[in-house]
Amino acid sequence: MLFRSMRRTLPAVLDPDLLRRCYPLRYLGLMTVCFVLMRPIMVGQDPTLGPLMKVLTAAVFAWLVNLHIVRRIPVSAPAILFVLYRLASLLPTVYRDGDLLNWGYVTLSQLSILMLIELYAGYGRQERRRLLRVMTDLLLIYLLINYVMIMTGTGSVASWGQHEFFAQPSYLLGIRTRVTDCVFPAILLAMLYDSGSRRRWGWRTVLALTSGIVQIVTLQVATAWVGAAIMAIVYPAVRLRLRAGGLLSMRGATLLGVAVTLLVVVARVQTYFAAQIEGLLGKSVTMTGRTDLWDAAIPILADSPLFGYGINSQFGAFIPAFKGLLWQAHNQYLQIAYDGGLVAVGLFIALLWTTSARADASRCDDRVRAALIAVYTAMSVMSVSEIYVYNMGTFYLFPFLASRAEELLGGGGRPEPGEGPRPSPVAAGGPTGTITPTGTITRIR
């Protein structure tokens, strides 16, 4: 009684119930964890914040490992495949004296995201939605800050070596083309979170779509236009069930990504559509010089096809270019082949196939299934000319979320009748109430 009377005299801003209900404060722990694991490019490149993020990532990984051991969470097939996939590039990295620190940092960071998703997949509905909400809001904040930096002209200048010819503005999410690393995952997370509400379109989905489209238009990212068009076609097709399975599935999207890479990079099928590409996208069939990079990359990869060359200190750049500069492959599968050879490529496809099959077999509703398939298909096709496993590494979110789609958004994670949800390890406080001697809860806050 004394505590209650004292609490009534406190200012509203000091009310513990208010602090518990306040979204930024209540979710601060989880928001911090997600920020460390999904840090924007500018933060990772900062000479002070970059090393700090590496230390914090190791701490978060150790914390998650401890939670998995204490709660006896079994090691999943996606986790095993991801570890094997990363180990495939470890051997050539060590053998060729590559960037072992970068390999370890990326491995711990992405594995921690998977472990965080699997941890929350076992909690109750409220906790599962909390994870989706925090991840969605974090990426939306990134997009809004990035757009403000674009409009105000703030940021830095990204250059390669001493050649100012290649210098271009860099914002929170990196250079112009890197905005797609955040746009499409933000759209997916927003659609997944809003699928749990009764509204057809939640404000997070609307904000993700509008902010993404505005930045794509402002920065003139042709690759993102292709992805947006694919997403706009696939989403209603899945919702209308025009064709069950086939290409309109997660496994179909995985196969489509591999097939498009072979057709565009190896067979050069785009040469037959030169007029359409130039008319719609304003691009030539060389795809802004990417075909020249692929022509130079393939002979290099052929010299070490099985195990590749490992993670180098040039952030994956290995193709000789203008004035001694090195470039990345500008194709996701070619870059993975350089990092870990055909072994890494095979394990990467196995990871995508396993998680896609699990998502296809899940009992998620049509909105969830359509969102996963549409955005994943778009990113799979866009990875033909870009690399989304580097930088923020947001491409990994697709197999990670797909592997736990039913638990996160279906009924797999709900507690049994009479059993309360497990408390979140990073949530500030839980529900409180008064229980009568008969076991009836009379009041809950």
Where are these regions (language model features)?
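N-terminal signal-anchor transmembrane segment
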Residues: 3-68, 82-96, 149-150, 379-381, ...
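A membrane-periplasm/extracellular boundary helix in multi-pass inner-membrane enzymes
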Residues: 148, 236-281, 298-302
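Long extracytoplasmic/lumenal interhelical loops at the membrane interface
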Residues: 277-340, 359-361
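Alpha-helical transmembrane segments of multi-pass inner-membrane proteins
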Residues: 129-157, 173-239
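Membrane-interface helix-loop-helix junctions at transmembrane boundaries of multi-pass membrane enzymes
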Residues: 13-23, 66-77, 193-206, 243-252, ...
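Hydrophobic, aromatic-rich transmembrane alpha-helices
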Residues: 4-17, 54-69, 184-196, 342-362
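Aromatic-anchored transmembrane helix interface
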Residues: 52-55, 77-87, 97-121, 130-134, ...
